[in-house]
UniProtKB/Swiss-Prot annotation:
Coiled-coil annotated spans: none
Membrane topology reported for the UniProt record: Multi-pass membrane protein
TM stretches of this protein: 21-41, 60-80, 90-110, 120-140, 147-167, 178-198, 280-300, 318-338, 348-368, 384-404, 418-438, 448-468
InterPro entries the UniProt entry points to: MFS_dom (IPR020846), MFS_sugar_transport-like (IPR005828), MFS_trans_sf (IPR036259), PLT1-6 (IPR044776), STP/PLT_plant (IPR045262), Sugar/inositol_transpt (IPR003663), Sugar_transporter_CS (IPR005829)
Domain of life: Eukaryota
Cellular compartment(s): Membrane
Protein name in UniProt: Probable polyol transporter 3
Functional note: Plasma membrane sugar-proton symporter.
Presence of keyword Membrane: yes
Molecular function in Gene Ontology: carbohydrate:proton symporter activity
Keywords: Membrane, Sugar transport, Symport, Transmembrane, Transmembrane helix, Transport
One BP annotation, GO: lateral root formation
Length: 508
């Protein structure tokens, strides 16, 4: 497959200034990701206290940790359909309500079954959040700033994880029965903040075009663009991608007809995709698979146990070392957000994955040495440094790029459902790792598990090298061409020419 080298593509946005309104919308949408990150991170420490309070075993802990992701599978597949029917904005609002209910139940948590129900409901919210936040951010962004804005949800996930770790450390000093319940229940507050913020967010202009609501889409496009000329160009590109028959437009507010070939989205996406769509789907599924198959969830969720295996024994020191993981993750994702639109997705991704291979191998070696020879000062230090290095390399590339890349490569008509498939694979792998890690460490040792992760990271590097072209600076409407497609039909070029020659009321 021929790879793009990251140069400016025709139609890319040359304007270096980020639109403040689009930035604000992306920030509000990303609050939902903070809640998800918090629910993920807080469980790493909360499980220590839950186990003591509710007298549960390792298997029940694995199920409690992993059920969030199994239920997220349901949420992500549902969100794909929901976001196409009621819109991106109201799907975000729905996910906030789901998180609110789940957080209240977990905070109440009088016993294990109620805790599981709350965790399951929160998991459905996770599926909604992971699918909708990057898609919404991508659809309101210009090409030149899409990497930055679309990486904000991943940054907010990391901030949420960090807040979860800090919550573990602070509330862990309270009584056993109260501490972990406050850790879990406090996640309800960001849901309320999002519920207020959603009232000030506009709908995605691309979704509005798909609904034939061009007048509304046009007004929002002006708000999220720096100039009317930029808004006009982006609006015309969306009309082309959405296959709107512009010859039937008398006035923008007068209604339009979308061209419909009778093909369902799922048939075009999965059952009988064109070659370009097939490559896009493989790329999206592959990057989501490898994001969690390389072991990041094991470190995020079980870092206190990993550090304990390495020789850290004090509960306070375990939780502090875990806070260090959260700080490292957040810091390097912040760096990544500024590099994505400058360096490009591909270079960062390959560098990130290569670094992960070395960090995982180093961690596996150090943990194996501790397993065989007992506490060794150098092995303890190496294991902690390797853990932080793995998190750093993951966070500067594979972590944020997974969501940026998979949310931008699908054609508009397939984006919501395509993104939901990627999230579903992501959650399956996340659940697989989180629900099997403790069992695997008993079977092949903790060091052995990280040797496996290192091998998977090698396979990931080769997959990314051959299957993922550069997308930096390319408009969303041009992605299908990047993967070798010419658009929905052979007359796409004619449709583009036709669109550019017709004045859309209000822009000219």
């Amino acid at each position: 497959m021929v790879h793009a080298d990251g140069h400016n593509f025709p139609g890319s946005d040359p304007n270096p200034h980020m639109n403040k309104f689009a930035f604000g919308c992306a920030i509000v949408a990303s609050i939902i990701s903070i809640i998800f990150g918090y629910d993920t991170g807080v469980m790493s420490g909360a499980q220590i206290f839950i186990r003591d309070d509710l007298k549960i075993n390792d298997t029940q802990i694995e199920v409690l940790a992993g059920i969030l992701n199994l239920c997220a599978l349901v949420g992500s597949l549902t969100a794909g359909k929901t976001s196409d029917v009621i819109g991106r904005r109201y799907t975000i609002a729905l996910s906030a309500v789901i998180f609110l209910v789940g957080s209240v139940l977990m905070g109440y948590g009088p016993n294990y079954p109620v805790l599981m129900v709350g965790r399951c409901i929160a998991g459905v919210g996770v599926g909604f959040a992971l699918m909708i936040a990057p898609v919404y951010s991508a659809e309101i962004s210009s090409a030149s700033h899409r990497g930055f804005l679309t990486s904000l949800p991943e940054l907010c996930i990391s901030l949420g994880i960090l807040l979860g770790y800090v919550s573990n450390y602070c509330f862990g000093k309270l009584t056993l029965k109260l501490g972990w319940r406050l850790m879990l229940g406090i996640a309800a507050f960001p849901s309320l903040i999002l519920a207020f913020g959603i009232t000030r967010m506009p709908e995605s202009p691309r979704w509005l075009v798909m609904q034939g609501r061009l007048e509304e889409a046009k007004k929002i496009m002006v708000l999220v663009s720096n100039t009317e000329e930029e808004a006009e160009e982006r609006f015309r590109d969306i009309l082309t991608a959405a296959e709107v028959d512009v010859t039937e437009i008398k006035e923008v507010g007068g209604g339009v007809k979308k061209k419909n070939h009778g093909k369902s989205v799922w048939r075009e996406l999965v059952i009988k995709p064109r070659p370009a769509v097939r490559l896009i789907l493989i790329a999206a599924v592959g990057i989501h698979f490898f994001e969690h198959a390389t072991g990041i969830e094991a470190v995020v969720l079980y870092s206190p146990r990993i550090f304990k295996k390495a020789g850290v024994v004090s509960k306070d020191k375990l939780l502090l070392a875990t806070v260090g993981v959260g700080l490292t993750k957040a810091f390097f994702i912040i760096i990544a957000t500024f590099l994505l639109d400058k360096v490009g997705r591909r270079k960062l991704l390959l560098t990130s994955t290569g670094g992960m291979v070395f960090a995982l191998t180093s961690l596996a070696v150090s943990l194996t040495m501790v397993q065989r020879f007992g506490r060794l000062a150098w092995a303890l230090s190496l294991s902690i440094v390797s853990t932080y290095a793995f998190v750093a390399f993951f966070s500067i590339g594979l972590g944020p790029i997974t969501w940026v890349y998979s949310s931008e490569i699908f054609p508009l008509r397939l984006r919501a459902q395509g993104a939901s498939i990627g999230v579903a694979v992501n959650r399956i792998m996340n659940a697989t790792v989180s629900m099997s890690f403790l069992s695997m460490t008993k079977a092949i040792t903790t060091g052995g598990v990280f040797f496996v992760f290192a091998g998977i990271a090698v396979a990931a590097w080769w997959f990314f090298f051959f299957m993922l072209p550069e997308t930096k600076g390319l408009p969303l409407e041009e992605m299908e061409k990047l993967f070798g497609g010419g658009g929905p039909r052979g007359d796409r070029d004619g449709l583009e020419i036709q669109t550019k020659t017709i004045s859309i009321g209000g822009f000219s």
